[in-house]
Amino acid sequence: MKNSNNGIDILEQQMADNEDICCSCGNINSFPKVFFDNYKVADVGIIVCTSGKFKISCNNVEYVVNKDETAFLSRDVYFSITSHSNDCSVVIILYSVDSIRDILGSTIVGMKFIEMLNPRDCWVMHTGHESELTKYSELLAVGNSDDNVFAANERRLLLLSLTYRLCGI
């Protein structure tokens, strides 16, 4: 996989800094290096395949994610990317709901209830919302600065919107 932009560099730096929101800033043509060796999802993990395909292993179960499909990774799950096609392009969003817990309230309780009803580590599906998830990744990257209070609050609202979108899928 070749990388055509600095989205992977930004994502890897966000992950190294343990930021609440780590996103690829749109499509990227590579995966973070840590994804190839049992990476732990702290809270919410989303990988949208926009072209090609890749294989992901979660707790010794392998899944194939094709173009226009999304892998949803559960909290505290370990996963590894086991292979990918040369034309693979993905959008990655990892975030902690703690940063918006005060806004979400009962929605978080509902999400935990759903996790108890369906405790799978990974779901792979075509949601029909892949282009919207890609757009969220791009929007979350805009104005990514702690110095700008407006941008920080806008990111929290985008994260809230993304969370509600995910609950509707």
Predicted regions and their residues:
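Short, solvent-exposed loop/turn segments at secondary-structure boundaries
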Residues: N60-V61, S85, F150-A151
